[in-house]
Curated annotation (Swiss-Prot):
GO terms for cellular component: cytosol. Keywords: Cytoplasm, Methyltransferase, rRNA processing, S-adenosyl-L-methionine, Transferase. Specifically methylates the N7 position of guanine in position 535 of 16S rRNA. The gene is rsmG. GO terms for molecular function: rRNA (guanine-N7-)-methyltransferase activity. It is an enzyme of class 2 (transferase). This is Ribosomal RNA small subunit methyltransferase G.
Length: 239
């Protein structure tokens, strides 16, 4: 996906980009590749691939959810900033918090935010299991997002405790989404979530399947969740 295709495909979806926003994506790409030489941020470094599989793929969430309001968003395990930083570039009014367990990635994100001149962004070095217990952030976000972090039964325990009641958990998934939903239904129920919508589409050019799950937070998450670091992965909430 070259820059012209990136721009025109987003415009078709009602997301026009200014020259400044296109410049921000260019700076993002250059910074990602530069830092990737000294630390492992991504296996994808070829320009057209980064624009398709990182930038465009992240923004697809906005094809199925309206980001036009100044929502507070928490991105769990964003790594090099996906999906929330591409969304923040497209929708500058969003208030973004990223939680990541690796300090090196947080250092990269702080540097990136300066280079991109982003405001209303916060980067927290923490495990999602610990972060989700903290006063002030627990059940505080309009939207919590994650892209390819863990299977749904595990991911729900990391994300739903952070979503305010009435808010939305957006899980960005690949081709195994149906199976993950089947295995993750019980976790959603326990944690106060309800799957409202699943949208399936093909990522352009490479035609790989993507699924975007919109999960509404209906009830407060029981206090015992999330459990201590590592437990959700070892012992997922499954029947």
């Amino acid at each position: 996906m070259n820059i012209e295709q990136f721009q025109s495909m987003l415009e078709e979806k009602g997301i026009p980009l200014s020259s400044r926003q296109l410049e921000q994506f260019e700076i993002y790409f250059e910074t990602l590749v530069e830092w990737n030489e000294k630390m492992n941020l991504t296996a994808i470094t070829e320009k057209e691939e980064v624009y398709l599989k990182h930038f465009f793929d992240s923004i697809t969430a906005a094809f199925y959810y309206d980001f036009s309001k100044p929502f507070s968003i928490c991105d769990v395990g964003a790594g090099a900033g996906f999906p929330s930083i591409p969304l923040k570039i497209c929708f500058p009014h969003l208030k973004v918090t990223i939680v990541d367990s690796l300090q090196k990635r947080i250092n990269f994100l702080n540097h990136l935010a300066q280079k991109l001149e982003l405001s209303d962004v916060a980067f927290c070095h923490d495990r999602a299991e610990t972060f989700g217990k903290k006063e002030g952030v627990r059940e505080a976000y309009d939207i919590v997002m994650a892209r390819a972090v863990a299977r749904l039964s595990v991911l729900s325990e990391l994300c739903l405790p952070l979503v305010k009641v009435g808010g939305t958990f957006i899980a960005m998934k690949g081709a195994a989404a149906n199976e993950e939903i089947e295995n993750g239904k019980y976790a959603l129920e326990v944690l106060g979530g309800d799957l409202k919508e699943m949208s399936t589409f093909q990522l352009p050019f490479e035609e790989s399947e993507r699924n975007i799950l919109l999960i509404e937070k209906k009830r407060k998450t029981p206090k015992k969740y999330p459990r201590k670091p590592g437990t959700p992965n070892k012992l997922p909430i499954e029947k």
